[in-house]
């Protein structure tokens, strides 16, 4: 883990692209309040969604995510694909987020889609 933060969060795609939200999260992570992490697949989903909603920003998206990666060392989680098919969520397309959280030893998942991550199910993996 980078820095001195002991609380780790995995960021869902929907919190990676609203500029005010992610700027706040990155700023707080830089103070070591918590360690923010995500995966390449979460980042790709966020970039795709942002490009759809704000096509005029398409050429700036790669630079934005590169800056986030530089600001938060060790933010990318990998090697979780083996878990995806074993997980059960209301929205199967979100299993990669939970798998990343498990492998990344996250304490919580930060998302606006709370209904897609049932508390009782996610808690069994030690995740809020």
Per-segment meaning from a language model:
Residues 73-108:
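Active-site neighborhoods of divalent-metal-dependent phosphate/nucleic-acid chemistry enzymes
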Residues 114-128:
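Acidic, PIN/NYN-like endoribonuclease modules and their adjacent C-terminal/linker elements
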Residues 8, 19-53:
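PIN/NYN-family metal-dependent endoribonuclease catalytic core
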Residues 8-14:
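Short, hydrophobic/glycine-enriched beta-strand segments
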Residues 33, 105-106, 126:
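Residue-level detector of structured alpha->beta connecting loops
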Residues 111:
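Short beta-strand and adjacent tight-turn residues that come in two discontinuous sequence segments
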Residues 1-6:
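Intrinsically disordered, low-complexity and often Lys/Arg-enriched segments
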Residues 37-81:
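PIN-domain endoribonuclease scaffold, especially VapC-family toxins
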């Amino acid at each position: 883990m980078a820095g001195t933060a002991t609380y780790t969060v995995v960021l869902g795609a929907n919190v990676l692209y609203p500029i005010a939200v992610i700027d706040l999260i990155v700023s707080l992570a830089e103070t070591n309040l918590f360690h923010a992490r995500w995966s390449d697949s979460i980042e790709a989903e966020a970039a795709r969604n942002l490009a759809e909603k704000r096509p005029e920003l398409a050429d700036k998206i790669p630079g934005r995510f590169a800056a986030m990666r530089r600001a938060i060392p060790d933010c990318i989680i990998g090697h979780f694909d083996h878990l995806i098919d074993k997980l059960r969520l209301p929205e199967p397309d979100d299993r990669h987020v939970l798998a990343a959280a498990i492998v990344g030893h996250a304490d919580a998942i930060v998302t606006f889609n709370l209904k897609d991550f049932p508390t009782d199910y996610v808690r069994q993996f030690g995740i809020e």
